[in-house]
Amino acid sequence: MNQNHRALWSCAMAAALLLTACGKTNAGSGSSGSMSGSSGTSSAQTQTAAWKTGLGVVTEATDQDRAGKIELAAAAVLLDGEGKLESVLLDELEVSVSADSTGHVTLPTDWRTKRQKGDDYPLAEVSSLKKGWAEQADAFANYLIGMTPEQVSMLKVDKDGKPTDADLLSGCTIAVDRYRDAVTRACANARALGAAKGDRAALGIEAVNGTSDITATDDKDVNAQVDVSIVALTTDADRRVTSAIADMAEPALTVVSDGGVTAPDLVKTKLELGEDYGMRGASALGKEWYEHSEGFCDALKGKTRTEIAGLSGGDADLKALCTIDITDLQKAALDALS
């Protein structure tokens, strides 16, 4: 996604958030008019008090000659009863793929995210702040606390996607436009799922190689794919899960027999695909993927990390809610709680 496309998406999301906010205000006024005054006030207070959990994923794929890159940014957010950011956690996965003139594909050997790599992602060495990726990403996340989704969506960056605000630059000099967009998307997706005041947002990612072949031929291209499982959680003071959202993305670069690499224009997650994912007809439960995901998330609520580690896809109660393979989603949830 180039800078122009990203800017257009940010403007569209800001407009959508503003329209959503206006729509909610008007809907509340209409409801009050059709009820007694005390009943309408009580309903409005209940809606306002709901704390919301959100997950946003922004995936960009680029190509150049015989090389390509997939960059996936994810944000877990917790919105307070006034709709302002209370807790934010960010992470990013970067996957580089190359090919030679015979169509042979070279894939990464390390599928960890930037946060998971820690000191193995050597940003601090070249940073003017001498800070690593996690420190700078957390500084950006902390800067957003107390903002509304609209304020986040309108955060200004320079032509390289880097912050322009002096206060933010004192703790973060990396490009943040993709993280801003992920947070904005997470806010737009946020729902009341059980989180409450005092909870904290958590985020976990499990990425695995989804590529079956490594050499393209005249008859068959290679889809250099990474399968990414993402789980956003909120936890209480006892580190028990109070809400959860689980999603997956399968971005892929196409490699042809002469080594040329082509990136997709758009990558949607399974939650974003919704009914278009097309799983319902093949599901023993008659459920679409997002409904299986909701069943898995329901099974996480109230549990600690140790209890989640003991979950089994073969458990009868879980199978009644979810029959998809939970292996990588479970690992992502455990990563969020580590």
Where would I find each of the regions flagged by the language model?
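Bacterial N-terminal signal peptides that target proteins for export
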Residues: 1-11
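Composition-driven recognition of long, C-terminal low-complexity regions enriched in serine/threonine
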Residues: 27-28, 204
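Active-site- and interface-proximal helix/loop "cap" or "latch" segments in soluble metabolic
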Residues: 47-338
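Intrinsically disordered, low-complexity segments enriched in glycine/proline and serine/threonine
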Residues: 6, 27, 275-278
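Low-complexity, Pro/Thr/Ser/Glu-rich flexible segments characteristic
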Residues: 29-47
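Bacterial signal peptide processing site
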Residues: 23-25
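C-terminal motif of bacterial Sec signal peptides marking the signal peptidase cleavage site
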Residues: 18-21
